[in-house]
């Protein structure tokens, strides 16, 4: 069974979803979709399906669509194939003209599953959170820099005066962390990237940490609470002297990578790398 997740805010998404349904049903593959789309697509409503029977998820949208569906349906762990109807698309990297050849590859087993690490975090007496890309501690409505003390396995690292701090996974290294000056990590690497956001001190650079460690972030400034957000979707507040704890999650994000997939080609295309300068 395949779970199909169109993003109705993308104009062609539902039309393409209907075409995908026809393609898969003609090959005797059962399909489910969220209840609001199931009737329109004439497939099984997700609320009536045992999620353990779902073999694959297919997302139609961009990377944001993938992140939202992971947070909305945390109990569905089937590998995910992302069809790109958005802009950059590092996670959703199947182009429109490659949809049906890619589905054929999926059906015939011409793929592998990347188990990408996730980060989980918690604050005392507050619900825990998880993220595929990153957890961000941000100054929120505070109009000035905030002070964040960072500890690694309880050992003091540094106090950063900045707009905030990004705790990124390798998947997230091409997202917010990259925009803030962080390095690119290949997606199956296991590591954290700590990337300060607009630090006051130029020498405060991003740092890559091994995944087995735990990270503690203490909010030192006597200002309004700051915001802790996971993948830009869910968030909660962190008050002065509260400590946010982050570590590798026991859960992974399983992404379908077709045999034809070339991560470095994706990097070149999405980041506009042109190779050697021609003079």
From Swiss-Prot:
Q: Which Gene3D superfamilies match?
A: Probable inorganic polyphosphate/atp-NAD kinase, domain 1, Probable inorganic polyphosphate/atp-NAD kinase, domain 2
Q: Which GO terms describe its cellular component?
A: cytoplasm
What SUPFAM superfamilies does this protein map onto?
NAD kinase/diacylglycerol kinase-like
Catalytic residues of the enzyme:
63 (proton acceptor)
Q: Where does the sequence pass through the membrane?
A: none
Signal peptide span: none
What does the UniProt keyword field contain?
ATP-binding, Cytoplasm, Kinase, NAD, NADP, Nucleotide-binding, Transferase
Query: Where is the protein found, in the record's own terms?
Result: Cytoplasm
Name the cofactor(s).
Answer: a divalent metal cation
Coiled-coil stretches are none
Query: Which reactions appear under catalytic activity for this entry?
Result: NAD(+) + ATP = ADP + NADP(+) + H(+)
One annotated GO biological process: NAD metabolic process
The protein's GO terms of the molecular function aspect are: ATP binding; metal ion binding; NAD binding; NAD+ kinase activity
Residue sites binding NAD(+) per the record: 63-64, 68, 133-134, 163
Q: What is its EC number?
A: 2.7.1.23
Q: Which InterPro entries match?
A: ATP-NAD_kinase_N, ATP-NAD_kinase_PpnK-typ_C, NAD/diacylglycerol_kinase_sf, NADK
Q: Which PANTHER family match?
A: NAD KINASE (PTHR20275:SF0)
Write down the HAMAP family for this protein, in alphabetical order. Answer: NAD_kinase
State the family it belongs to: Belongs to the NAD kinase family.
Tell me the function of this protein. Answer: Involved in the regulation of the intracellular balance of NAD and NADP, and is a key enzyme in the biosynthesis of NADP. Catalyzes specifically the phosphorylation on 2'-hydroxyl of the adenosine moiety of NAD to yield NADP.
Its recorded name reads NAD kinase
